[in-house]
């Protein structure tokens, strides 16, 4: 990690802790998971049905091929930090934390302190929260990595995260969750616009066009860019959709 990246990383943690202090949280606070009523949870899942199906299509093959022997759990949460689904090893943590990894659990910082899911939402980018970087002591046995999933309108549609209580290579874990979230974002764009629009694929080398890290521009019949993924903005150094 380069010096400026480390400085930014430390700032993310410090800013989150300051928010927790402002909300009146204490390090010894042990919150109960906040869950929506069953009818409300059903409505939330219905609203995010496409996100759920797309994420499952991307995550399950990757988990089976790469992570099936790892002690980790993959969570999909909505834009308000409510868990929509999970995949992986449910034995990753002690019994008292298991309710937090179940559908409907809400990870908002205001209730459960610094954590990968809602801190990622707060900063609008990927984060990794190591054990003692969690504001609440109750969460310090786990490591979380998370990255937001953006829709075609630059809004956060959800958050993909990986939690573990084992010493996995953390740089690899954060890179993996970023890759998966980008894959989901790309597939959401493809589903939304489909064959009725023109798609331009960008990358730094010609042999990487099929990579999830490719930039995607979607154009209408007049050639106007109407949608793009985050990677396209990074490659072009500009907001491609105004």
Summary of predicted features, one role per range:
Residues 89-92, 96, 233-241:
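PAS/PAS-like sensory domain cap-loop motif
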Residues 117-118, 242:
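Terminal output helix/cap of sensory domains in signal transduction proteins
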Residues 133-151:
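Helix-to-coil/beta transition segments that act as allosteric "coupling" elements at the rims
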Residues 1-108, 118-128, 141, 150-222, ...:
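Intrinsically disordered, low-complexity terminal regulatory regions
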Residues 134, 223-224, 232:
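Short, glycine-/Ser/Thr-/acidic-enriched flexible segments
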